[in-house]
Amino acid sequence: MNSGFKKIVADRRLRQGRSARTSFVIVDAQSVKTTDLTKNSGYDGGKKISGIKRHLAVEINGFPQAIHITRANITDRDGAIALVTFNLEQFKLVRTMMVDSGYTGQNFANEISSLTSAKVIVVKRNELHQFSVIPQRWLIERSFSWLGNYHRLWRNCERKLNTSLMMVSLAFIRLLLKRY
């Protein structure tokens, strides 16, 4: 299923006059609550959520280049490294990776550089308690909000992480097919 999804995204990029593969990705994670039936859940202390994390790497249109699902107790940095590790083919041509302040640290940047040739840009907010739109970061937040349109993804009801991954992939496939 992932190969078909990647083909649809590549076709969409070609129609826009871009290359099939992107050289710029934005990476972020979203914590999602789980139901009582779910066995694969962890506790995200930062957001105080017991559940899973969806790690996404999106291109400039907001469509995923890679998706990875982990328990919520996995840090954003470790989840992003796993995301890149399991999807190395998608990150071959990536030159720049934009992340938020949850991914700070020289070790993270070095690990990403050793896996790919991408340069990591950490975008931070200037004022802690003031809302401001950070340029290009809204693209990944929009992608997460698209997932909110699918009732099944509001809360994780799946027993296996791989099933959650497939549900997220199906939601993005439906979104792409609906638009084009």
Model-derived features: where do they sit?
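Short alpha-helical elements
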Residues: M1-Y180
